[in-house]
From Swiss-Prot:
Coiled-coil parts of chain: none
Gene3D superfamilies: SUI1-like domain
Name of this chain's protein: Translation machinery-associated protein 22
Record CDD domains: DENR_C
Subunit structure: Interacts with the 40S ribosomal subunit.
Family statement drawn from the similarity comment of this UniProt entry: Belongs to the DENR family.
Limits of the SUI1 domain: 97-168
Length: 199
């Protein structure tokens, strides 16, 4: 058996939800005028309050104008907040994470992860996770731009990249660019042709 749903003429929600709109008094007046059974079911005998509000609303249009102004301000604030969130999301999606492999002494190297501060990731916690997951030394340091980066000892750039991809995907940032740079590769010397000394 289907039940007919009544929608409020003031806030356009079912009367059960009118109390969440901030227009409860006007909603009660509308419901009392249009569906007294439902009004009695929801609010009981609240007739005196409804009559008082109806009289005041009938006498003064300032209440409606003020309510409309407040509603417009609220809509503007919501639109601003939404656009701010969209800009923040676009900034996060357009930023990139750089995983740089750098040479240390002899054949040792380290991996530096930069660009994660945009995604509100706790760097110290991430460093501890890397240290325990990869069984290696790991620390947080600041680069020349005064931004934090995670320094991991060892040649584990691929494993770190896979972990960061999974971490960003978990946060809902699947389209973020993760770039791997190998600064440890030595430039090959171009062979120079030397002429043997004349004998």
């Amino acid at each position: 058996m289907l039940k007919k749903v009544v929608y409020c003429g003031v806030c356009s929600l079912p009367p059960e939800y009118c109390e969440f709109t901030g227009k409860i008094r006007r909603c009660k007046v509308w419901l009392h005028e249009h569906d007294q059974e439902l009004f009695a079911q929801l609010y009981g005998d609240d007739k005196e309050d409804v009559d008082g509000v109806a009289a005041r609303l009938g006498q003064s249009s300032i209440g409606e104008e003020r309510e409309e102004q407040l509603e417009k301000k609220l809509q503007k604030l919501q639109a601003r907040e939404e656009s701010k969130e969209q800009r923040e999301l676009a900034r996060k999606l357009s930023s990139r994470v750089v995983i740089r492999r750098e040479a240390r002494t002899k054949r040792k190297c380290m991996v530096v992860v930069a660009g994660l501060e945009v995604f509100e990731i706790d760097m110290k916690k991430l460093a501890k996770t890397f240290a325990s997951k990869f069984a290696t030394g790991c620390s947080v340091s600041k680069n020349v731009e005064k931004k934090e980066e995670v320094v991991v000892q060892g040649d584990i750039a691929d494993e770190v990249e896979a972990y960061i991809h999974a971490l960003l995907e978990e946060k809902g940032m699947k389209g973020v660019k993760v770039e791997q740079i190998d600064a440890a590769k030595k430039k090959k010397k171009t062979p120079t042709t030397t002429t043997p000394p004349p004998s």
